[in-house]
Amino acid sequence: MTDNAPTSGHDLYTTAGKLADLKDRYHEAVTASGETAIEKQHAKGKMTARERIDLLLDHGSFVELDEFVRHRTHAFGMEKKRPYGDAVVTGTGTIHGRQVAVYSQDFTIFGGSLGEVAGEKIIKVMDLALKTGVPIIGILDSGGARIQEGVVALGKYGEIFRRNTAASGVIPQISIICGPAAGGAVYSPALTDFVIMVDKTSQMFVTGPDVIKTVTGEDVGMEELGGALTHNKISGVSHYLASDEPDALDYARTLLSFLPDNNLAELPVFESDVQLEMSDADRKLNTIIPDSPNQPYDVKTVIEHIVDNGDFLETQPLFAPNIVVGFARVEGRSVGIVANQPNAMAGTLNIEAGEKAARFVRFCDAFSIPILTLVDVPGYLPGTDQEWTGVIRRGAKLLYAYAEATVPLVTVILRKAYGGAYIVMGSKQLGADINLAWPTAEIAVMGGQGAVNILYRNEIKAAEAAGEDVAAVRTRLANEYTYNVASPFLAAERGELDGIIEPAATRVSITKALRALRTKRASLPPKKHGNIPL
């Protein structure tokens, strides 16, 4: 159908004829691409735009917008093909009964390319989401800007980016990449809060392999350059590596269950039968910390013992694994968790870990999600690579994020808390509300072994001269330093800790702390915005 005339013999001067014409047009809108294009999409292991929406939203809840719009381009013979919808499906619906807005690019029509009308549809649904204060989910599967429409198509990207920015910190924004996203198209998901990619079928890159080969001579494939694994493990662009499209859509549904509708809405509250008496499961935490300070453990085990039902939704699990971030519930209420991971790089902070945690902390603060920080950090990762690539500036992002946060902040020091890394990880000095520590905590400028080399240099030389067991002397002096200088009781004496608890009491202590902080009110000095060290 290339104009407004009916293709059937319906009598449009009667109500019955008009209704029949509407039915025909609606059928054309939902089957605009044709069976052949749909079969090609399925052959690639990909769902169609409408199938994705149907799986994402509650059954029967989708209300489509602008299904009858068509492009206005006449260049390059485009006037001969003007399908309804113009390569994107937009509308509203519900997830777990809560209202959301959604758009899903349709690769079966013009390769999902973004032209003037497709851009207008996305902009319109974004405006609606912002106006009504509901999350927006974008499902991307597009070849990029529609070259037949030139600068008009590019301009629509700019308008989308501006709305992404306006919505940032106001409504949750989730991007699900189910196919290619190239060139300028990648910046919209980059501006959203969470990016989900599908293994083997989704790619994101600013410049494609062919251009890279021409300009630099570098030979790289699409998957290696911008595949889902690359962006989940190396670049950190993506927050979750989905095994397939249903997995990606299910992750988005689960993620939304932890988030409010907007920055002024209350967090969702789920039924909880949390008991405030110590349980046998709680007591298992009393044996989680090894006697040797150099022996690692999995901090996720700690997390699972202190949150409701042991359920923890991790984000960016493959990127910067030395720090763990994600969502859980305590007493049925959402919390954001930031935890050093001794199982990876001994839990040290590096550039990637700092930026990962900083972005997460700022998201939680924007949407009034309390933050629980679990600390076991020996310091910053040393090395010229870190220094030369900006650990000072980029590492300060996490410090900035904690210092500006006004949500409830609860910190528990599990073991090591050394040097500047101790301050950065949700310390009392940065504004944390409740700071607790296990008796295994060590809080000092540096660890015992490092301190021995500075403080006990003469004693070590004397031991060497006397033919003593230098290793044993070092160990004894390090233990003395840890006991006399790094003991958590010293920090508690100075009021830098609000309490020292046995590990088994952590779940109950956190629950009570978050209860006490529900009515917290804090604000920052009036300003247009801060200048985070980007």
Predicted feature descriptions by range:
Residues M1-L534:
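Ligand-binding clefts of soluble mixed alpha/beta catalytic domains
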